[in-house]
Amino acid sequence: MTNTPPTPPIAPCQEGFVETPEVRLRYLTWGDPGATPLVLLHGIGQTAHTWAYFATAMQDHFRVVAVDQRGHGDSGWAPDGDYSAAAHGRDLDALILQLRLEEFALVGFSMGGRNAMWLTDRHGARLRRLVIVDAGPQRPHATGSSARQFMSGPDVLDSVEDFVERAVRFNPRRSRETLRESLLHNLRQLPDGKWTWKYDPVLRQPSRQTTPAGDLWSVLAKIACATLIVRGAESPALPEEQAARMAEVIPNARVVTISAAGHTVMGDNPIEFEAKVKPFLVEKNTAG
């Protein structure tokens, strides 16, 4: 039996869709529609529901918008298999335009963190605050191997519980109940009664799990808004040295580390994640 942290409650949310020239994007919202928007971007193989606990914690202060990025959750799959940062960027441009996000805060995890970094290059003037979660311009090989290890397992199993068992073995930091809740939003049942992932199988290919070459360091140097860099204490994804360099390159940034957390920081230790990230976001929001 694992000593997992307590799980916060989840509030109900609303569902919406944005039509882009390439895919249909599904998003979830919490909070007052008139409040400052807070956009949340998940990692590879995840869904908008990844953020449910954190979104619940933020709904009294923001209009929270969590997106199923292309190829994930209930959003459309890329017709040409394009899951590059540029493709994600086009989708997010459409989301920002159609939801009329004149000014917003942005939080991105892993793949979503890198997509968030690229987004600052085009929408920096709109950003109130930025949170980059366990993602950096350079990805250690250990991270890619770990992610691919989980995604490269069997993609069809007899039951949801079979997926839960596999997830428990892969990430013992989280309770069976929280893993099941997360998986239920990330699985679909096949006509023969078996279960498989919602995400596009193309994403299981290692070559599709990387963003295209580009100098993210130069992008970081131009970020004008206050930035919080969050890393998991037990995660290989964002080494202390790289996080420290990011904080030096970004003009107004600092680093926080979440204890008892691997790569999926906000799910492994949601209480501490909220305690360290919420004040950073709310401070600017209440300042007007």
Each language-model region and where it sits:
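Alpha/beta-hydrolase active-site loop signature
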Residues: 45, 69-73, 113, 137, ...
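Conserved acidic catalytic loop of the alpha/beta-hydrolase fold
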Residues: 87-104
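Conserved alpha/beta-hydrolase catalytic His-Asp/Glu region
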Residues: 154, 158-214, 219
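Alpha/beta-hydrolase fold catalytic core
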Residues: 1-38, 60-62, 101-102, 278-288
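Conserved serine/cysteine hydrolase catalytic core
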Residues: 190-248, 254-257
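Conserved hydrolase catalytic core segment
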Residues: 102-141
